[in-house]
């Protein structure tokens, strides 16, 4: 497996050549399509580990033979490094670790990706991701067929004691939730359908200002659910003024406030934003191979890229966003310059641009931003 390397202070991170499409999609498409506009840089190709021109068919054949587990293990290793470097960088309203778990489906054409299976008339793969909310980094990822139900992979999550796990209603599986409770972890999950239960304790708590409508301790009485989850559960009804909708949450934590439970669920959107970022800025919609191996390799390469960019952002570019760092890297792969020097000059330019925007804005309008409790 060919690699290029990025050095961040005393650490060197080898990056698979398969990650180049994520780092620089424009350059890669030109290279693969045989466009000659990169001819002046041909003597610099060795810097990227390239030899002769790479065709799409050659890359497809190579990825067909490669074992995606190598890329999976490397992605998980970079995830571990990125989480370690970002831990404690941001203040959070709760001291426990908080994770949001969800999946995103990458649609594939069944006639081309023949190994996929139909699910609701569509074929594709699912990327199931456990997202570290406090550190804005994925902590676990697994790829399955689109036909696999979300709750079926809950038993593969590496649960941590005293940590919170936030789930959407697709994960309202009482058997899996009870397994989380047995580990000593906490969950917050949205109600999927009306549950059959009896009230054990009604806290008679109602706060229209924050949206909490009720906070009760219940016991499931359904024929199946009472066997799968025999302990009391906390049920919170919350009204969201912004969306004009009522939500029902279940949790096994009885200590945090009802408002905090609702706020924790709002942070579930962080994993949705991560999926949106990945699909928008990294190449996981167009694949260079049609086999299952090729698809998995490219998805894991994209996750590797995200983690690498996050590490560089944390170590060298605190004033820049993850996307801004990605843009700099994608346009500078053929530039032989120390990363710190490259990013430092970019940060200075960004600060000047921001100052100019603030000055121009203040000339014409004075913004009043209301305090939003939520």
Regions found by a protein language model. Name each.
Residues 42-57:
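Short, basic interhelical loop/turn and adjoining N-cap
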Residues 39:
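Alpha-helical residues within the helix-turn-helix
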Residues 116-117:
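Extracellular beta-strand-rich solenoid/capping regions of secreted or surface-exposed proteins
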Residues 1-36, 49-52, 63-66, 70-82, ...:
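Single, function-defining residue in the core of a domain
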């Amino acid at each position: 497996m060919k690699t290029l390397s990025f050095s961040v202070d005393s650490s060197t991170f080898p990056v698979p050549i398969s990650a180049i499409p994520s780092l620089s999609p424009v350059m890669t498409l030109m290279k693969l399509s045989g466009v000659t506009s990169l001819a002046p840089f041909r003597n610099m190709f060795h810097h990227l580990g390239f030899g002769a021109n790479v065709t799409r068919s050659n890359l497809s054949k190579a990825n067909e033979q490669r074992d995606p587990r190598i890329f999976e293990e490397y992605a998980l290793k970079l995830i571990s490094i990125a989480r370690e470097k970002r831990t404690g960088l941001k203040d959070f309203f709760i001291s426990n670790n908080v994770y949001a778990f969800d999946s995103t489906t990458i649609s594939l054409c069944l006639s081309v990706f023949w190994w996929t299976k139909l699910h609701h008339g569509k074929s594709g793969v699912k990327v199931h991701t456990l997202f570290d909310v406090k550190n804005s980094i994925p902590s676990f990822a697994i790829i399955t067929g689109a036909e696999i139900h979300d709750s079926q992979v809950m038993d593969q999550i590496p649960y941590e004691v005293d940590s919170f796990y936030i789930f959407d209603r697709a994960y309202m599986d009482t058997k899996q939730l009870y397994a989380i409770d047995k580990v000593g972890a906490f969950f917050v999950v949205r109600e999927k359908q009306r549950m059959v239960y009896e009230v054990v304790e009604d806290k008679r708590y109602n706060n229209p200002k924050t949206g909490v409508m009720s906070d009760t301790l219940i016991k499931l009485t359904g024929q199946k659910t009472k066997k799968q989850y025999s302990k009391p559960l906390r049920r919170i009804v919350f009204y969201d003024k912004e969306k004009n909708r009522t939500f029902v949450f279940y949790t096994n934590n009885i200590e945090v406030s009802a408002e905090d439970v609702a706020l924790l669920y709002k942070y579930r959107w962080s994993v949705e934003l991560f999926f949106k970022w990945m699909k928008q800025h990294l190449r996981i919609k167009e694949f260079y191979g049609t086999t299952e191996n090729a698809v998995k390799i490219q998805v894991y390469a994209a996750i590797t890229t995200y983690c690498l960019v996050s590490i560089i952002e944390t170590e060298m570019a605190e004033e820049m966003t993850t996307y801004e760092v990605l843009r700099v890297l994608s346009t500078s792969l053929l530039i032989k310059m120390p990363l710190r020097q490259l990013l430092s000059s970019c940060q200075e330019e960004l600060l000047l641009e921001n100052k100019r925007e603030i000055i121009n804005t203040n000339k014409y309008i004075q913004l009043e931003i209301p305090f939003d409790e939520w």
